[in-house]
């Protein structure tokens, strides 16, 4: 018989840096999930990734206090900032100076990496979504 699902929890955790301090500890603890067990499993699963990369994770926890988790790709904003070599987007997107520039080739690379997490039918649709995110961050898309 399958385990009875008690709920799901969505967190964004830095790769290789899961520890019991906030926000992870309280979020898991109040649901009765073994915090250290999650931290060890998550850190082991992300040890090959770039340390500090934000990873969205969906934790499904069961009534017997066990859990499973699924990791997604880092957010689009992370990829955009990395490709444009900036630390943050523009404070006034669309008005003031541009925070940086990206090429269509860079947008396509990001779209291919994020395709399975995006709600897009094809690569062109995914690129359009990512270009919109780039413009919202004050980045200019050229080429």
Curated annotation (Swiss-Prot):
The annotated subunit structure for this chain is: Part of the ribosomal stalk of the 50S ribosomal subunit. Interacts with L10 and the large rRNA to form the base of the stalk. L10 forms an elongated spine to which L12 dimers bind in a sequential fashion forming a multimeric L10(L12)X complex.
Keywords recorded for this protein, A-Z = Methylation, Ribonucleoprotein, Ribosomal protein, RNA-binding, rRNA-binding
Key word Transcription regulation present: no
The record's function comment reads: Forms part of the ribosomal stalk which helps the ribosome interact with GTP-bound translation factors.
- What Pfam families would the database entry show? Ribosomal_L11 (PF00298), Ribosomal_L11_N (PF03946)
- PTM note: One or more lysine residues are methylated.
| Gene Ontology cellular-component annotations | cytosolic large ribosomal subunit
Matching entries from InterPro entries are given as: Ribosomal_uL11, Ribosomal_uL11_bac-typ, Ribosomal_uL11_C, Ribosomal_uL11_C_sf, Ribosomal_uL11_N, Ribosomal_uL11_N_sf
Q: Which family does it belong to?
A: Belongs to the universal ribosomal protein uL11 family.
GO molecular-function terms, A-Z: large ribosomal subunit rRNA binding; structural constituent of ribosome
Q: Does the keyword Ribonucleoprotein belong to this entry?
A: yes
Gene symbol of the encoding locus:
rplK
Q: Name one GO biological process term.
A: translation
For this entry, the protein name equals Large ribosomal subunit protein uL11
